[in-house]
């Protein structure tokens, strides 16, 4: 892969770390801010909703700016937002800082996806997207477990200061390696051309399958710390090593999903979403058995991130050249709306007394909705192709 794609991977690592790090710090944050664990979990939902709002707004506002300039501005927002998190004197400040940080997220991955696919041959586009998203998997593999350990040893604020330093490093790498001209297009795209993508049914279906397909993961992953400690029975010190196992699964799934999508996008979409639903059902069955739970958490990581490149490429293809940046950013927002939906659904499940053990079952049901939407979308493709192939009467 070109060095510029690897630079985008570095930025993705920083953003991925700040998104997911709170999941390993929920108990510490809840205790320090004097709120319940479900209320602390809303910090995840707040971040996700900030991505959902910020992605389309910033994408449209920056559509005429050079792509590299946009990427650097977003990394600056990210870095300042994490510093604000570390300084938060109360829950409300922390929530506001998380939302500020989140504004950079969707547009960075949206613009980054367009830049990454512009740097490689057409048959390597999904792999280029997957390479950039390796930053997210490494963030989960190393950043989140490190954050959980760092928070346990030095406090959750120190973990956010560490992420701030990561942001500075990522800014420098993107500035040094990403070309100034890549991804800018031959001519500026008008606002009407960009927004017109929202009228395409396949784009909207693609966004919906991303929301529901990914929400299932976050029903479980948002509450992974209390699940492992309070239900499965692991000591708190075991959470970081288990998150390393999950992160290893994400890394495997991310690469596998890119390769599968390059070989056949439709099969990759259906196969990965179906696998994710099946693994979640399996996790529900073995959650009380420690060794089996660890094995299923590894498989959960593989299945979850195998969906990323197929879902992102599906929306890019449906959008076409004129709407690809907005559609790409909106799909990142859709991932995070799924994050918020999953965190909310998990919190409701807990608050209604169904218990932590019910979370994987709820998650599997939500993911199944994403699978049904994918099947519907592909059926529409076949119908449209058949109509186009019929000669006019």
Model-derived regions: residue spans:
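C-terminal transmembrane helical hairpin of 12-TM major facilitator-type secondary transporters
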Residues: 267-311
């Amino acid at each position: 892969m070109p060095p510029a794609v690897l630079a985008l991977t570095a930025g993705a690592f920083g953003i991925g770390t700040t998104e997911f790090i709170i999941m390993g710090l929920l108990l510490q944050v809840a205790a320090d801010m004097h709120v319940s664990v479900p209320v602390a979990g809303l910090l995840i939902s707040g971040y996700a909703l900030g991505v959902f709002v910020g992605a389309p707004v910033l994408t449209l506002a920056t559509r005429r700016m050079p792509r590299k300039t946009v990427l650097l501005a977003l990394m600056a927002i990210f870095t300042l937002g994490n510093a604000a998190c570390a300084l938060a004197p109360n829950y409300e400040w922390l929530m506001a800082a998380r939302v500020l940080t989140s504004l950079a997220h969707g547009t960075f991955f949206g613009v980054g996806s367009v830049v990454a696919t512009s740097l490689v041959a057409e048959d390597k586009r999904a792999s280029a997207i997957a390479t950039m998203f390796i930053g997210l998997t490494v963030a989960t593999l190393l950043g989140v477990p490190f954050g959980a350990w760092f928070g346990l040893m030095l406090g959750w604020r120190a973990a956010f200061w560490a992420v701030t330093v990561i942001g500075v490093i990522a800014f420098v790498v993107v500035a040094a390696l990403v070309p100034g001209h890549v991804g800018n297009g031959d001519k500026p795209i008008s606002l009407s051309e960009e927004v017109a993508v929202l009228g395409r049914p396949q784009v909207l279906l693609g966004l919906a399958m991303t929301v529901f397909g990914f929400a299932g993961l976050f029903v479980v992953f948002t509450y992974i710390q209390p699940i492992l400690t309070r239900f499965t029975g692991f000591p708190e010190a075991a959470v970081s090593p288990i998150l390393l196992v999950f992160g290893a699964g994400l890394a495997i799934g991310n690469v596998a999903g890119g390769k599968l999508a390059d070989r056949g996008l439709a099969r990759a979409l259906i196969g990965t979403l179906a696998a994710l639903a099946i693994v979640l059902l399996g996790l529900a069955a073995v959650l009380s058995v420690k060794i089996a739970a660890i094995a299923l958490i590894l498989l959960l990581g593989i299945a979850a991130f195998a969906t990323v490149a197929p879902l992102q490429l599906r929306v890019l293809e449906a959008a076409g050249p004129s709407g690809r940046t907005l559609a790409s950013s909106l799909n990142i927002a859709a991932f995070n709306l799924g994050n918020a939906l999953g965190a909310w659904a998990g919190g409701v499940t807990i608050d209604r007394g169904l218990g932590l053990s019910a979370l994987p079952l709820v998650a599997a049901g939500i993911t199944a909705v994403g699978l049904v939407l994918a099947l519907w979308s592909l059926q529409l493709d076949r119908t449209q192709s058949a109509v186009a192939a019929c000669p006019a009467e």
